[in-house]
Design a protein with these regions (language model features):
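Non-catalytic interaction/Regulatory regions outside core domains
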Residues: 1-92
């Protein structure tokens, strides 16, 4: 699985609009990262995804997407089962 994850991270970074990507487990442990998102962001990313899920409680969409917006870009965070993914995109 590790080599597959590494390949997905590398493929994601090929998009010129993406400057960072991070995958964590449910405890915030880093599974892999590239670019502007690093090991130190894992815990925050995991907690944001978990807290957003408790806020929504929508049975039709149990896994909300968190979007942190700034003038320079967005960080999108979403959980997929036991893995949380964050993608840092520059503003277009």
């Amino acid at each position: 699985m590790e080599s597959t994850l590494e390949q997905h991270l590398n493929d994601t970074m090929k998009n010129p609009a993406i400057v960072g990507v991070l995958c964590t487990d449910q405890q915030g442990h880093n599974l892999g990262c590239r670019g502007s998102l690093s090991d130190e962001h894992g815990g925050v990313v995991s907690v944001l995804a978990r807290q957003a899920a408790t806020l929504t409680r929508d049975p039709t969409d149990p896994t909300p997407t968190v979007c942190l917006e700034s003038d320079s870009g967005n960080i999108l965070i979403r959980s997929h089962g036991t893995i949380t993914v964050a993608v840092h995109k520059i503003a277009s």
